[in-house]
Amino acid sequence: MGDLAAIILAAGKGTRMKSDLVKVMHPLAGAPMVAWPVEAARQAGTSRMVLVVGHQADTIREHFAGTEQVAFALQEEQLGTGHAVASAAAALDGFTGRVLILCGDVPLIRPETLRGMIDAHGATGAALTVLTTRLENPFGYGRIIRGFDGRVIRIVEEKDATPEERGRREVNAGIYCAEAAFLFDAVTRIGNDNAQGEYYLTDIVTMANEQGLRCTAHPVADPVEVMGVNDRAQLAEAGRFARQRINRELMLDGVTIVDPAATYIDRGAVVGRDTTVHPGVHLSGETRIGEGCTIEQGAVIKGSTLGNGCVVEPGAVIRSCRLGSHVMVKAGSVMEDAIIHDHTAIGPMAHLRPGTELMAHVKIGNFVETKKITMGEGSKASHLTYLGDASIGNNVNVGCGTITCNYDGVRKHRTVIEDDVFVGSDVQFVAPVTVGRNSLIAAGTTVTRDVPPDSLAIARAPQVNKDGWKLKQRDQ
């Protein structure tokens, strides 16, 4: 394929988005819009890329900071696409290969389409190849004008076209492949004598023909690939097509998606074979789902890793977590920055806050909240409990209503519960405190001192029964 560079036009503000955020940075299925053509160009085999930036240039630079092969060119005034490409010339000084030109607001172009255009460009010996498509309603697009031999002789913008030219349905997709020597010479000679007063890149088609160079068209069958995004309605439409593409690829790889139209999976997510994804699920960020999992209705998983055989019930929310294999997350549970080992069950309606680590075969039941704790293998807290700033050993039973009192109004303190401890219901641990292994904490106890191993701790007022008291109260 030879040496290949790409110029991606991303300098426009995007007024029709009616947003404080520059258009090309609006998210599309998990990535800024401009990241899609950047990735397509990378997969097409480019060795160098130049992003032409203008409005909110620093925002775009920051997103791509550290990205290999990406350089930036500043277009301080947006004077048209020809001016934008000319702005990138210095960044490709000395480059003698072929140059792809893409638009940052045309996100759905496929790498395969770009490779096909590059191959056709080389096979025909063209100086310039224009990607085209046919539209039922071509309004707003530049029309392709061909010569008798089928070559492209010029492109006419909508506002400059005659009625006959406006009737043509083959349109310019705004994506090109050009020989670098021709391109960078041509863009220095573009004028702005047109209805918009701009420097149109399309004028280089006429220049190629005037120089006796070949200019060809490479048609793309699916117009969706070259749809532009100018407002939020079009952004939503592009998002729908992007999700269709993502979901179809996953299904062809062995994932069951019950209702693809109602399933929202970002392009960065990976889902293993034989996993079933139900309607209303959102998988976003760098999420990794193992094989044989079940993700039920309305679950939200962001930036998390799930091992094989996990089950996530309806309405669960998992953010920045790492789950082992065969973990059960029951309905309505919320987890953030937690590490969960194999064969552990969470919920329903549990809340695991940052810093939670649960070892294998742990059970966290309904209305249990944890924060900055480790819980050893086989331990369980089945219901109505708060565990914060605690280290809990193996095979510990935490009774209903247990609370670690970890905050004294100034500092947080830790509770340590060693292996094989049984904690009865309605127990408070006033930290800092340590409970030795194999101890029993009686129900209703407030623990304020360390408990030795193999001990019974009981701290509650003795029960007093007053016979006949209720009858005496009634007679008064």
From Swiss-Prot:
Residues 254-476 are annotated as: N-acetyltransferase. Keywords: Acyltransferase, Cell shape, Cell wall biogenesis/degradation, Cytoplasm, Magnesium, Metal-binding, Multifunctional enzyme, Nucleotidyltransferase, Peptidoglycan synthesis, Repeat, Transferase. The active site is at 383 (proton acceptor). One of its GO terms (biological process) is cell wall organization. Binds 1 Mg(2+) ion per subunit. Mg(2+) binds at residues 105, 230. It is found in: Cytoplasm. The keyword Nucleotidyltransferase applies. Its main location: cytoplasm. Residues 1-232 are annotated as: Pyrophosphorylase. Its EC number is 2.7.7.23, 2.3.1.157. Its cofactor is Mg(2+). It is an enzyme of class 2 (transferase). The keyword Transferase applies. One of its GO terms (molecular function) is magnesium ion binding. Acetyl-CoA binds at residues 406-407, 425, 443, 460. In the N-terminal section; belongs to the N-acetylglucosamine-1-phosphate uridyltransferase family. This is Bifunctional protein GlmU.
